[in-house]
């Protein structure tokens, strides 16, 4: 192969690779239907939502609809909240408190639907991560979804 044909082949490969990357990025739609089922929004972890109701023009008109207070789950000044809430089927799921309780909250009203707290016993007292809660995931197993969390 001559140096000229080598350069042409390299340039062609670069164009094909860049073209593939660009088309892949454009093809990813992001989180669907206003839901946030995964840590990164969707299965591809794009952290993108295609929702367009909030714009620069109407941003200043936004009002607080509801607020989720978690102080009744054990206020601790050094608590480190690192959870990414999930939104599935009109319900927001999040970890709360120092024992990583999981709550389900109605996305429209802010009403608590349920709370689950696993009794970790002595293990929790010695755990280096006892003051943080993250690790929620959603699994769609063909009809009935599951909320999974790491304890």
Predicted region positions:
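Bacterial N-terminal signal peptides that target proteins for export
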Residues: 1-13
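Short regulatory "switch" loops immediately downstream of catalytic or recognition motifs
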Residues: 1-4, 70-72, 119, 139-141
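Short alpha-helical segments used as structural interaction elements across diverse proteins
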Residues: 4-7, 44, 131, 136
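Bacterial N-terminal signal peptides
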Residues: 11-23
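Short beta-strand segments and strand-loop junctions that repeat across beta-rich extracellular domains
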Residues: 27-28, 102
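Aromatic (tryptophan-biased) beta-strands that constitute blades/sheets of beta-rich domains
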Residues: 28-75, 111-125
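Repeat-blade elements of multi-bladed beta-propeller folds
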Residues: 33-40, 78-101, 127-151
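Short loop/turn segments that connect beta-strands within beta-propeller blades
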Residues: 106-109
């Amino acid at each position: 192969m001559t140096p000229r044909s080598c350069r042409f082949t390299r340039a062609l490969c670069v164009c094909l690779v860049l073209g593939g990357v660009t088309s892949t990025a454009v093809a990813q739609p992001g989180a669907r239907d206003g839901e946030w089922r995964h840590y990164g929004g969707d299965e591809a972890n794009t952290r993108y939502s295609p929702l367009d109701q909030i714009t620069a023009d109407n941003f200043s008109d936004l009002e607080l609809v509801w607020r989720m207070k978690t102080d009744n789950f054990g206020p601790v000044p050094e608590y480190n909240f690192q959870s990414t809430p999930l939104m599935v089927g009109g319900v927001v799921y999040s970890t709360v408190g120092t024992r990583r309780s999981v709550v389900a909250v109605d996305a429209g009203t802010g009403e608590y639907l349920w709370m689950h707290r696993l009794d970790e016993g002595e293990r929790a007292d010695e755990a280096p991560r006892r003051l943080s809660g993250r690790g929620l995931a959603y699994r769609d197993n063909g009809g009935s979804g599951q909320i999974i969390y790491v304890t």
